[in-house]
Amino acid sequence: MRIVVVGAGLAGLTAAELLHNAGCDVIVLEASNRVGGRAYTRSAEFINGQGAEAGAEWVDNVHTRMRALVERFGLRMDDNATTWTAIRRWLFRDGALLGPADLAGLDPQLGDELDRFEGFFASVAAGVSDAAHPAQHPQAAHYDTLSAADIVDQLELGELARLFATRNMQGEFAAEPHEVSALFVAQQRALYEAAATPHGEVVAQRIVGGVSGVTAGLASALPQGMIRFGETVDAITIDETGAHVRAGANSYHADQVVLACSLVPLRAVVFDPPLPPELAAAVHGLGYGRVTKTALQYPERVWPAGYATTTGRAQRVYEPTVGHPAESGILMGYTGGEGGTRLADLAESERMHEIELSQREMYPALPPPLGGFSQAWSGLPLFGGSYAVYRPGEITRFWDVLRRPHGCIHFAGEHTATWTGYLEGAVESGETVASRLLANR
């Protein structure tokens, strides 16, 4: 069986290795000049052996596939396990950096209101009997019409709780609250609830040396020449002999095609015959988050430990170099949703300047930065966004259709996984498609 895999990110590499090891004839077409896709560690911009993730960053203790890959390639997780309640620790507002005690003084109800916000989604999640099939929720049609913003309004959250709820949506889903389906949030909560049962408290960690160590390991397991770089697919024709995948002047024949890339570049691909209407609607319509990650390295660390939420342009500021022995450190500005889009419209140097100003407002003692980068995923045509976000109405319309085979066309990538939006989901989707193809050959 000859298979063309489009995309050399985690999903494509996972599928390619499994299919190759099972004896299939596999070619991987990658439009860029590197593997990994949105799993991308950048270190060339920094000194002292430090680096930061331009894309996906966290591997939770419940992400068993990713943990297995980390072990397989001789990597390790860092020692700084983080719980997601840490994002409430600091708030920069009106020129002041406020800690937990300050926040409690400003609004004694803040913690309770945020608990009510999360509690709503937990109650909906209780009706998600299988996180892989959220549309089977008894009230799926109702909850999928609601957005996270609708829930904020229904609960009448106060000013500070609204800010934290907004930043949570911008951070977790890379979108504004009105762009996130309440059913999608509930699906994610149900997934974590089920996964956490055998693992206890869910904590997140980074991979020492970066996630690119995993993608490099997977790529090295494939035969030389299997991955064809600089091959941008522009047409897929299906006839009685199979699929013909065109990338510029080159054409590749396949029995099966695995589309393991973001849906956004597929919107420019000519399919002959055209995709079925419901599938075409999903390919062209599914929402994508907009994250701009701006990492700046400073010669010394003059900031407190922990996440900081800000009303400024950086949205969330944290240190990805916690635990690194060097005196220097990196501050990350994580900007999602409309803020991420606004930054993406600027040149990289302008983005870095904007985030430096925002960080300096928070920490006036910051010395001049040594270097850095700003990665705006929504501004890159090969990706068109950071990761999928199912907007109101899209779970019931798009979830199932993207996870089914369509003749010889199969979709993989985090947008087709139960672990949507995560490195774990990319690996999961590659395994799922490979298993399906091998079961039916």
Where are these regions (language model features)?
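FAD-dinucleotide binding site
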Residues: 1-441
